[in-house]
């Protein structure tokens, strides 16, 4: 079983990520993490923060000479902007007079940074967080609720994808299928071999015409002083049959995937396979018939289920989609109430992206990888990569005799 968690604030000194249960013998390097984090920074419609803030990643524990040791893996992602925030975000008490000193910018930005944020933003964690945690302003809430935290999850996803590929040959790919009302028109489904092309495309799609329409939708939203959402799709190839279970609700693979994807900031909907569209079909057309393939093994005539039946992987590619609402930090500020004065106001505004669906696809891929790696560990667990491979091979040999 894998267990992971993250810590850190958006403008704190660093994000931390730890994961327990990673077997020994997994090949992973700091450069792998850098490449993974670089993918998260791509995309049309990103905000100014991506231009000046760097992900300073380092592995603190659990890896030696590029190979995991079996101990918990700890990762640190430093915040290159920390010097500008070390007074405002100090863990220790700060003399109020310190806030009257500039942050080396030659102006009073430090004062603005520390101004109480008492006008909660609609769509954010601000208001429920302030009330639930009994704090007078939104800074302690928004710092942790920020999507900046997903950088740590993407780093963990790099480890998960390495585990899936090195043990079971499972590989993942993600892409954007819609932006606002614009939907992809191409019927081609990307494979992991298309990763370089997807990274080169500003909207993470293989079709140039789709890419241009998606860009235009983002441009229109930005010009209107607004934000725009979209849908990202993740596909996992060569997933062995039998991951997950029908036995308990919390261990159903589709339930775990849905929970993981819904945990991403801005995600408001998840579907597996044909998802909501499947509800419009008759039963005779909605399910994937089982036939004997040319090689004598069982196969399917379609993949409406998205690779999961009864909470268990069925051997077909796993397909999951996440719907991202438009970012809540809207330049055209929405109405709110100042909790310090009780007066009507507009929600506070900080720099933000116009569209987050491209990095959202990369984050969704990381979440799917973590769930699948955990399910693989449950099914073929071992203390080393070699032991996991042997366990999986023995299981698949038995399955191959029957199906």
Model-assigned labels for residue ranges:
Residues 1-403:
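Generic N-terminal targeting/processing segments that precede catalytic cores or assembly contacts
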């Amino acid at each position: 079983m894998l267990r992971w968690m993250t810590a850190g604030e958006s403008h704190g000194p660093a994000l931390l990520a730890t994961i327990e249960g990673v077997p020994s013998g997994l090949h992973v390097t700091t450069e792998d993490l850098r490449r993974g984090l670089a993918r998260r920074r791509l995309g049309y419609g990103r905000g100014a923060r991506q231009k000046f803030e760097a992900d300073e990643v380092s592995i603190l524990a659990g890896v030696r000479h590029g190979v995991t040791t079996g101990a918990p893996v700890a990762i640190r992602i430093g915040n290159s902007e920390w010097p500008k925030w070390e007074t405002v975000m100090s863990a220790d008490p700060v003399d109020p007079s310190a806030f009257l000193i500039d942050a080396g910018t030659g102006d009073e930005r430090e004062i603005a940074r520390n101004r109480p944020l008492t006008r909660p933003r609609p769509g954010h964690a601000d208001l429920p967080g302030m009330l639930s945690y009994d704090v007078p302003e939104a800074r302690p809430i928004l710092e942790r609720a920020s999507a900046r935290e997903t950088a740590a999850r993407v780093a963990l996803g790099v480890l998960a994808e390495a585990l899936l590929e090195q043990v079971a040959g499972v590989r993942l790919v993600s892409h954007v299928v819609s932006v606002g009302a614009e939907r992809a028109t191409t019927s081609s489904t990307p494979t992991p071999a298309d990763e370089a092309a997807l990274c080169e495309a500003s909207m993470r799609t293989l079709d140039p015409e789709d890419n241009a329409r998606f860009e235009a939708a983002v441009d229109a939203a930005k010009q209107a002083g607004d934000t725009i959402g979209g849908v990202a799709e993740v596909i996992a190839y060569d997933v062995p049959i039998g991951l997950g279970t029908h036995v308990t609700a919390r261990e159903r693979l589709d339930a775990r995937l849905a929970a993981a994807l819904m945990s991403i900031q801005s995600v408001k909907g998840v579907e597996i396979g044909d998802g909501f569209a499947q509800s419009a079909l008759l039963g005779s057309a909605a399910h994937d018939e089982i036939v004997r393939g040319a090689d004598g093994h069982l196969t399917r005539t379609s993949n409406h289920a998205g690779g999961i039946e009864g909470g268990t992987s069925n051997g077909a590619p796993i397909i999951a989609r996440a719907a991202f609402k438009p970012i809540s930090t809207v330049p055209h500020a929405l109405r709110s109430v100042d909790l310090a004065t009780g007066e009507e106001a507009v929600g506070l505004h900080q720099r933000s992206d116009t569209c987050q669906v491209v990095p959202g696809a990369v984050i969704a891929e990381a979440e799917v990888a973590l769930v699948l790696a955990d399910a693989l560990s449950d099914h073929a667990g071992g203390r080393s990569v070699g032991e996991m491979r042997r366990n999986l091979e023995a299981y698949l040999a038995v399955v191959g005799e029957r199906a």
